[in-house]
UniProtKB/Swiss-Prot annotation:
Residues 20-487 are extracellular. Glycans are attached at N65, N73, N352, N427, N431, N457. The lineage of its organism: Viruses, Riboviria, Orthornavirae, Negarnaviricota, Haploviricotina. It is found in: Virion membrane; Host cell membrane. This is Fusion glycoprotein F0. Disulfide bonds join C64-C185, C324-C333, C348-C356, C380-C385, C387-C410. It is a single-pass type I membrane protein; Single-pass membrane protein. Homotrimer of disulfide-linked F1-F2. One of its GO terms (cellular component) is membrane.
């Protein structure tokens, strides 16, 4: 029953995925995981957003001196004044005067920017192009300043120039204003000051990089999220004509922002948002494939299949998406990154397992399990699979390539030295027997390391033999050295003894000579007497 449920779930995920056979693939350790749509994008349109850095606050008590507002304005002015000066400098350098040709003005302006990358130069030129719109928006600052709406349209005559945003106005309208109605001046000051201080901290984080050069430092997606606050979904819906949610757009990283105007008197900032043009490729799905080792024909093997495929009808192609942006639901690409697969690989993906190619694996540094949607797919013949709650060892028969484990059979699972808590579908083992031809198992780097391990083992054995021979030679050399030293000592002692004998012989001979001479002299003396 668990197997049927699992197959139904995967089949629903892959609805419209053509001839890809998830049930057959899971039998050999290939698990289809994420299924996404494919979209192509290019930068095309832009929108302007004016951000009111100071919310509209109507004090119900006349005569109150709200010092927190003055302090906030002074701090924000110090923080953003370098940005305003930088914007003015770049604008003056890049916008030609009447006496100066446009081309010459741009060249001189870019030279004034110093060393810059192509992206930075593009950002600077974009600043010039947006200057007219930013100026038109800031000319309506009085109308913008009077509104206390969190999001409002900026309209000149019948032309919509952009969207006015007050990131903290929602909080002011719903929380602060009702609270200060019954409060005194000090309480009002404290409440308003706390809100403004929090927003000031966020502004400091957002514009840290822009203080150096706003034209060359685009605003990040995280900064846009903080800057627009709770108004973000509304701003995206009003400014951009797209069916994609604000969360999806932000997670894609395709939205970029750039400061193009600033008015510190009214605390208003104009931001240009670049939005890509998106096109969906119909009837196409990008499917991720997670591959684990499987126990087939009494050996551990791994299927040789791509990690990501594109399925269009009955056509299956590899899709690395190396130059694409991937979100949980969509793959955004500038171009089609598909690669043609061999006939055998396509047949394998379609469920013909006799056409699949496998590689034998040796060692522990490989993938033997994968977790997806609260389910564990594991090769329990090649690793320890132990259920901790309830306590039991999970056995995988030789006829089963992989084992599927879920919470109905095991809540707490141990895989070798790792422990998991499973939260979701039934512990089931595929009972189908898969027979592979010898030609299906190929040695493919880097998965097949058996030959390399054999070579390493042989090298180790040879090294041990050489070490043993070295010990023998060393022992022989040591013995020979000891014998040589003793021989030298014996020769030296023998030589010294011989020299002593010679010296003693000479001395004795001299003494005998003297004695004989004295005796002869005494005999001659007696005879003459």
């Amino acid at each position: 029953m668990g197997t049927i449920i699992q197959f139904l779930v995967v089949s629903c995920l892959l609805a419209g995925a053509g001839s890809l056979d998830p049930a057959a693939l899971m039998q050999i350790g290939v698990i289809p995981t994420n299924v996404r749509q494919l979209m192509y994008y290019t930068e095309a349109s832009s929108a302007f957003i004016v951000v009111k850095l100071m919310p509209t606050i109507d004090s119900p008590i006349s005569g109150c001196n709200i010092t927190s507002i003055s302090s906030y304005n002074a701090t924000v002015t110090k923080l953003l004044q370098p940005i305003g000066e930088n914007l003015e400098t770049i604008r003056n350098q890049l916008i030609p005067t009447r006496r100066r040709r446009r081309f010459a003005g741009v060249v001189i302006g870019l030279a004034a920017l110093g060393v810059a990358t192509a992206a930075q130069v593009t950002a600077a030129v974009a600043l010039v192009k947006a200057n007219e719109n930013a100026a038109a928006i800031l000319n309506l600052k009085n109308a913008i300043q009077k509104t206390n709406a969190a999001v409002a349209d900026v309209v000149q005559a019948t032309q919509s120039l952009g969207t006015a945003v007050q990131a903290v106005q929602d909080h002011i309208n719903s929380v602060v204003s009702p609270a200060i109605t019954a409060a005194n001046c000090k309480a009002q000051d404290a409440i308003i000051g706390s809100i403004l201080n929090l927003y000031l901290t966020e502004l400091t984080t957002i514009f840290h990089n822009q203080i150096t050069n706003p034209a060359l430092s685009p605003i990040t997606i995280q900064a846009l999220r903080i800057l627009l606050g709770s108004t973000l979904p509304t701003v995206v819906e009003k400014s951009f004509n797209t069916q994609i949610s604000a969360a999806e757009l932000l997670s894609s990283g395709l939205l970029t922002g750039q400061i193009v105007g600033l008015d510190l008197t009214y605390m208003q900032m104009v931001i240009k948002i670049e939005l890509p043009t998106l096109t969906v490729q119909p009837a196409t799905q990008i499917i991720d494939l997670a591959t684990i080792s499987a126990f087939i024909n009494n050996q551990e093997v791994m299927a040789q299949l791509p990690t990501r495929v594109m399925v269009t009808g009955s056509l299956i192609q590899a899709y690395p998406a190396s130059q694409c942006t991937i979100t949980p639901n969509t793959v955004y690409c500038r171009y089609n990154d598909a690669q043609v697969l061999s006939d055998d690989t396509m047949a394998c993906l379609q469920g013909n397992l006799t056409r699949c190619t496998f590689s034998p694996v040796v060692g522990s540094f490989l993938t033997r399990f994968v977790l997806f949607d609260g389910i564990v797919y594991a090769n329990c013949r090649s690793m320890l699979c132990k259920c901790m709650q309830p306590a039991a060892v999970i056995l995988q028969p030789s006829s089963s390539p992989v084992t599927v484990i879920d919470m109905y059979k095991c809540v707490s699972l141990q895989l070798d030295n790792l422990r998991f808590t499973i939260t979701q579908l039934a512990n089931v083992t595929y009972n189908s027997t898969i027979k592979l031809e010898s030609s299906q198992i190929l040695s493919i780097d880097p998965l097949d390391i058996s030959q390399n391990l054999a070579a390493v083992n042989k090298s180790l054995s040879d090294a041990l033999q050489h070490l043993a021979q070295s010990d023998t030679y060393l022992s022989a050399i040591t013995s020979a050295t000891t014998t040589s030293v003793l021989s030298i000592i014996a020769i030296c002692l023998g030589s010294l003894g011989l020299i002593l004998i010679i010296l003693l012989s000479v001395v004795v001979w001299k003494l005998l000579t003297i004695v004989v001479a004295n005796r002869n002299r005494m005999e001659n003396f007696v005879y003459h007497k």
